Amino acid sequence: MAISMSMAMATPTDSVSRVWSMSSLKSALPSTASLRLPSSSSRRPVTLRLPISSPSLPSFSGLSPVNPLLSIGLPDWQSFENGFKIVDGGGRIYAMRHGRRVPKLNRPPDQRKALLRGLTTQLLKHGRIKTTRARASAMRKFVDKMITLAKDGSLHKRRQALGYIYEKQIVHALFAEVPDRYGERNGGYTRIIRTLPRRGDNAPMAYIELV
Amino acid sequence: MAASVDPLVVGRVIGDVLDMFIPTANMSVYFGPKHITNGCEIKPSTAVNPPKVNISGHSDELYTLVMTDPDAPSPSEPNMREWVHWIVVDIPGGTNPSRGKEILPYMEPRPPVGIHRYILVLFRQNSPVGLMVQQPPSRANFSTRMFAGHFDLGLPVATVYFNAQKEPASRRR
């Protein structure tokens, strides 16, 4: 439909009347808004305007900072403050570590996952283990996750736990005893006790134990 | 976030085994050349023989020493909490347990699974209890609180604990 295509290209802010409405915003979106136009166009006669000026179509225009108001909702949306960084997948990349909370443990992602799986398996098996402080504080989340799965107790959760813990018996023992042991406790199923550094490399060590 | 910095609270010794107390006596424990501080790691091979314990205080006061393990058989499943290793009563102040009456002979730490805490608790006795105390029927499922309540020992006057785990059978290469 020619009308819907042209309305998809209309920009909301270069109208004289400056009518901001959800329907006019949706009409600026490239694809799916066209489905809703029949209902919105009956309410708002402004959206039936044909576009007069279209060169300010917010497509990719090099690395120059684009007017943010024109580019809302498009994949090339760039942030207000640094209009010069390259963005992919909608994620922002900064030079600093601000706000990044995943502990990398000096390992690539596959090794990191395997390390955490092994550590949670051993903690659930032995009840108290001694490891470095970074590893102990990184594994808290996953131990709590396993205990939460055991608290739920359904077959699906059991299979999810079996996919994470390396030993079957530990999962079955966990599912058997967790409701008695942690039934009333909401979260915080581990405790970390800092201890003396390791002799070989002076790494700060900690005991992590199940509460 | 630790609500307290006292190592006995952080290590949950107060809570699992004891109640909150104010230490009024000094006790220094030595396994061989190694002095025991709260939470230090001891190898079972160095703890085969009973430790040297020096107790402060006057010689007319009598003390009771109890050594237990609240993490028996495994810290994740402490079914046999607590396992008592050593009970000595009627120790005169200022001396060591060899001068007291050993109710339960010393058993060395032998943790099968995991890292166990071994707690040495000192009580001050109000009166000599040597004749009334008998050996507990079994070492397992001991309760230090009930033991203290039974013989009217009150709150402990000193406590220290250490960790031990099973040593690997062969030396790591």
Curated annotation (Swiss-Prot), chain B:
Keyword Lipoprotein part of the UniProt annotation: no
GO terms under cellular component: cytoplasm; nucleus
Stimuli inducing this protein: By abscisic acid.
Entry-linked SUPFAM superfamilies: PEBP-like
GO biological process: abscisic acid-activated signaling pathway; positive regulation of seed germination; response to abscisic acid
Disruption phenotype: No visible phenotype under normal growth conditions, but mutant seeds show hypersensitivity to ABA during seed germination.
Role summary: May form complexes with phosphorylated ligands by interfering with kinases and their effectors. Regulates seed germination via the abscisic acid (ABA) and gibberellic acid (GA)signaling pathways. During seed germination, MFT expression is directly repressed by ABI3 or promoted by ABI5 in the ABA signaling pathway. Involved in a negative feedback regulation of ABA signaling. Promotes embryo growth by direct repression of ABI5. In the GA signaling pathway, MFT expression is promoted by the DELLA protein RGL2 during seed germination.
Chief localisation class: cytoplasm
Record's keyword annotation contains Iron: no
Protein name as it appears in the record: Protein MOTHER of FT and TFL1
Localisation per UniProt entry: Cytoplasm
Family to which this protein belongs: Belongs to the phosphatidylethanolamine-binding protein family.
Keywords: Abscisic acid signaling pathway, Acetylation, Cytoplasm
Residues with PTM N-acetylalanine: A2
PANTHER family, A to Z: PHOSPHATIDYLETHANOLAMINE-BINDING PROTEIN, PHOSPHATIDYLETHANOLAMINE-BINDING PROTEIN 4
Tissue expr: Expressed in gametophytes and developing seeds.
